């Protein structure tokens, strides 16, 4: 099984961009990739249906990527609040069922979280219960800030204590020409202090948008995809 759960620790870390980019790369390499967003808050009301902005971005990169969301709420807040206002309680069995269907149709499925691992989904379950139930490894997306290392350590340690399988960390929005020793040392600090592997570095992009080809190239060159999926990818030898 080559499926992973992608989550963030700090806000605006860009996990949707990373998730979509990895899926687009794998699709371009000839694999059938999927992105599953179990819970989408801030969905767009199109009248007859709700539209997931995150999955729309995925489709913009590659329309052939399989996508799905089980629960969608227009309110842009934590799922626990959104589902109470929307009168739809989040059930891990529903998520597990949809996950199994999607996993059977794809070569690899990237499951993207809403919020962090400790985000409450209802009175008794948190986001970390999703990868725990699905039995898939977790990848953290973080931005380089030594001021937040304590938060990163606490989040990763909490995940380990919960029994989650941690695949590693992807550092997003990393300055290409970092002149700060603190920023330069950030990847090593994460590996040594948090005892977790850095799977890749993705640079900062100017503006709020990124071209598909640019993102695919950045992912190919910046992330160890074989470590992400824990598999050999023969076509990568040609890049």
Annotate each predicted stretch with a short phrase.
Residues 1-5:
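Extreme N-terminal starter segment of soluble prokaryotic enzymes
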Residues 6-19:
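Glycine-rich phosphate-binding P-loop
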Residues 17-89, 100-101:
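N-terminal phosphate/diphosphate-binding loop that engages ATP/GTP or pyrophosphate donors
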Residues 32-33, 109, 138, 166-167:
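Hydrophobic anchor at the start of a short beta-strand
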Residues 37, 139-142, 167-173:
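Short internal beta-strands
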Residues 78-121, 128:
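Phosphate-binding/switch loop-helix module in NTP-utilizing enzymes
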Residues 122-145:
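Inter-motif core of Ras-like GTPase G domains
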Residues 157-239:
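C-terminal lobe/tail of nucleotide-utilizing enzymes
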